């Protein structure tokens, strides 16, 4: 699946694994009985937690932005979404001159897609 096609939990799992470096597994959530995604920092033994909703939660997406900054990427400030039908756009610039752009239904979704593109380069 292409990065620009990732949404929902698939996007969250990809971010947890490829951006944040977590181990990620799909498991049955014992509280709901439904299949969901869980992660833990690599080499941490126990301690699996539900993968955060990086594409939907502004708070969770801040972790993505902090990790990108640590790796030399900065989010370029762009215009705000003016129409509900307009896709959100995120542009990331690296200190070495590289840039990536992604769009999404929300700024968080666009940030997650841009992060995956940036770290795939």
What are the roles of these predicted feature ranges?
Residues 1-121:
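Glycine-rich anion-binding surface patch
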């Amino acid at each position: 699946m292409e990065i620009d096609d990732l949404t929902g939990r698939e996007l969250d799992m990809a971010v947890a694994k490829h951006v944040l470096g977590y181990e990620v597994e799909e498991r049955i959530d014992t509280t709901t009985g439904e299949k969901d995604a869980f992660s833990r920092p690599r080499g941490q033994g126990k301690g699996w937690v539900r993968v955060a909703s990086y594409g939907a939660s502004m708070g969770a997406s801040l972790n993505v932005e902090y990790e990108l900054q640590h790796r030399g990427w900065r989010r370029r400030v762009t215009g705000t979404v003016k129409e509900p039908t307009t896709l959100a756009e995120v542009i990331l610039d690296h200190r070495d001159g590289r840039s990536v752009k992604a769009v999404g239904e929300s700024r968080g979704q666009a940030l997650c897609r841009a992060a995956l593109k940036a770290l795939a380069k």
